[in-house]
Amino acid sequence: MAFRLAPTDFEMLRTIAEYRIMTSPQLAALLSRSKKGVRDRIGKLITEGLLKEAARGRGQHRGRPERIVFLNKPGVTLLKEQGFIESQIPTSQIIDEKFHYQNHQLLLNWVRIHLNHVKTVTPGLKIRLLSHNSLFISKEFSSISVQSKTGELIRFEPDATFSIYDSNQEKTLLFFLEVDLGTEILASPKRILTDLRQKILNYGICFDTQMYKRYERLWNCQLNGFRLLFLTDTPSQMSKICSLAREMQPSDFIWVTQKDRMFEDGISANIWARGGRLDTSPQSILGSLSCRAPLP
């Protein structure tokens, strides 16, 4: 019998295009499907040449390396023909088999999946997110440009920008997210853009100049500031960033957590060190709507 693509197959292919690389547990969690069912369907899509897979580096996990999947050229062509991807986007921009930042991308994926889950746990919330390397993001909002006190133009890309709208309070909160795996320098005398201290300073300029208010036009909302979120890979890196945040007053807009906290209690729980303060009770980015929302 000839292979036929189901609507759920197009949903899976488009999701992988949006997230760039994924694992079967991520797809199962996001699409609310069984892990076995997702693995089986991935296998068929690989056989049909629409997807490819590769072994993820062993990293911190024991046993066999986790498999990651990504679009193959015929998969890209199909999504373009169906209108899911704009035809002018180069295939080379969509497929990157080198995966220099696969651990970073996969952790960013988990953040997005957790945020998506929050919407099902807390009715009345609307969450809108822009990922820095999404195929579907407008170039206008893929980066932020600010001008330093010396007149230097500084351009930087948050790993993700998202807003949470509470329909009960009719209030929108804006968040910038930085996923940190401990590969960047905390503070360099040269103040390079990847220096975490400089990153925080850049966001401070974004606040002072109210550059963040351009998202009001995108999401048709009113914004009064934002929160800068750091999600770290390890407790030790969380401690380092918290220490840095406490040194850089005012730092109340900086919130820090660690991935194990997110996986255990969910991204909306009281897992965040506000202002880098570890000597006070952790808080929730949802404030009074705080809730535990671990993935099923």
Regions found by a protein language model. Name each.
Residues E157-D159, L174-R191:
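Active-site ExK catalytic segment of metal-dependent nucleases
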Residues I94-H100, N133-G151, T183-R191:
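Surface-exposed cleft-lining segments at the edges of enzyme active sites
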Residues P123-F175, Q198:
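Active-site metal-binding core of divalent-cation-utilizing nuclease and nuclease-like domains
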Residues L13, I185-I192, L201, Q210-P296:
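Non-catalytic C-terminal interaction segments of nucleic acid-processing enzymes
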Residues M1-F99, Q105, P296:
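Nuclease-adjacent, charged terminal/linker segments that flank catalytic cores
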Residues T122-L125, Q169-K171, E216-G225:
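Short helix-terminating capping/connector loops at secondary-structure junctions
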Residues R56, H132, E178-G182, D233:
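Short loop/turn segments at strand-loop or loop-helix junctions that form parts
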